[in-house]
């Protein structure tokens, strides 16, 4: 079930890039509004302010039905992954991430809002401290307990992921909401190895894994031009957010919360609330591949 976001009220200081909030944080590293604006160690990957003052197409966003426009020209998204290209799962110090050999041209996505073929690079999750929140995107102000991101790069236009990640139309990210429900058998393969990567910078080898098993059966989606939600916040992403969530069990999500932001020998810092603040839509067009039906969304 969709839940109203308990994190409001929330204000982002656009000029200094620091965050003030009541309730749960949209970034786990929260600083006083009176603090000097500086790039201090909010997070080991962080190199800039919480909010990009110059950015005009930042992510994530609150997907509002009133802002969504049905586009009959949006084709179905074509998804074809090579399970054998899965390499390892690791704790990045911000989330756990599954890496793939992206030299395989055939493993990726095309169609939908995309003009080129995009190769799969990695996927990761964002989640909250409880089952009440955790997704990066929201829908009419409602959030899910977690969100999956499958990250792909434009192999037609760019030589490698690094160049694509900061280039125009360089990345395509599929977002999938996770909601509480039935046990997810395919996800369990990942959950089973999480104890081996509890600490930051630890990894475990993975056998074949096809991440299409994590996608919903219904492939209706919203799409909009946006950015990475972690530094460097590059505005290189075509977002493809699935309308239909996938079900996972409470125990599976609880295992996510056993991971740590901290490394071995450091004070334990539980890995939760690893999501970015919502960003304004501004004048961007939010398109949908489906005709809007509110009654079917709230499930």
Swiss-Prot record:
Keyword annotations from UniProtKB, A to Z: Lyase, Metal-binding, Mitochondrion, Transit peptide, Zinc
Tissue specificity statement from the Swiss-Prot or TrEMBL entry: Liver.
Catalytic activity reported: hydrogencarbonate + H(+) = CO2 + H2O
The protein's Enzyme Commission number: 4.2.1.1
Class of enzymatic activity (EC top level): lyase
Required cofactor names: Zn(2+)
pH dependence: Optimum pH is 7-8.
Domain of life according to the entry: Eukaryota
One GO CC term on file: mitochondrion
Presequence range in chain numbering: 1-29
GO biological process, one term: gluconeogenesis
Localization: Mitochondrion
Family of the protein in this entry: Belongs to the alpha-carbonic anhydrase family.
Protein name in the entry: Carbonic anhydrase 5A, mitochondrial
Organism encoding this protein: Mus musculus
């Amino acid at each position: 079930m969709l839940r109203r976001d308990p994190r409001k009220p929330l204000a982002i200081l656009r000029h200094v890039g620091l965050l003030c909030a009541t309730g749960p944080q949209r970034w786990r590293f929260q600083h006083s509004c009176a603090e000097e604006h500086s790039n201090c160690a909010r997070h080991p990957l962080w190199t800039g302010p919480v909010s990009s003052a110059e950015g005009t197409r930042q992510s994530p966003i609150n997907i509002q039905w009133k802002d969504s426009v049905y586009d009959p020209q949006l084709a179905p998204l074509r998804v074809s992954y090579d399970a054998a290209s899965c390499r390892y799962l690791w704790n990045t110090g911000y989330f756990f991430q599954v890496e793939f050999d992206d030299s395989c041209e055939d493993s990726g996505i095309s169609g939908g809002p995309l003009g080129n073929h995009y190769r799969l690079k990695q996927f990761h999750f964002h989640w909250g401290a409880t089952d009440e929140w955790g997704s990066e995107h929201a829908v009419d102000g409602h959030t899910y307990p977690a969100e999956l991101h499958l990250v792909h790069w434009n192999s037609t236009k760019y030589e490698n992921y690094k160049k694509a990640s900061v280039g125009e139309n360089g990345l395509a990210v599929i977002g999938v909401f996770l909601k509480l429900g039935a046990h997810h058998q395919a996800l369990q393969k990942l959950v089973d190895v999480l104890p081996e990567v509890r600490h930051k910078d630890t990894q475990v080898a993975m056998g074949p894994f096809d991440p299409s098993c994590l996608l919903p059966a219904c492939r209706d989606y919203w799409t909009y031009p946006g950015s990475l939600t972690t530094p460097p916040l590059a505005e290189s992403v075509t977002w493809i957010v699935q309308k239909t969530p996938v079900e996972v069990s409470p125990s599976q999500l609880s295992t996510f919360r056993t991971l740590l932001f901290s490394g071995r020998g450091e004070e334990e810092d539980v890995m939760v609330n690893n999501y970015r603040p919502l960003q304004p839509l501004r004048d961007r067009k939010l398109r949908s591949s489906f005709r809007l039906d509110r009654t079917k969304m709230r499930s």
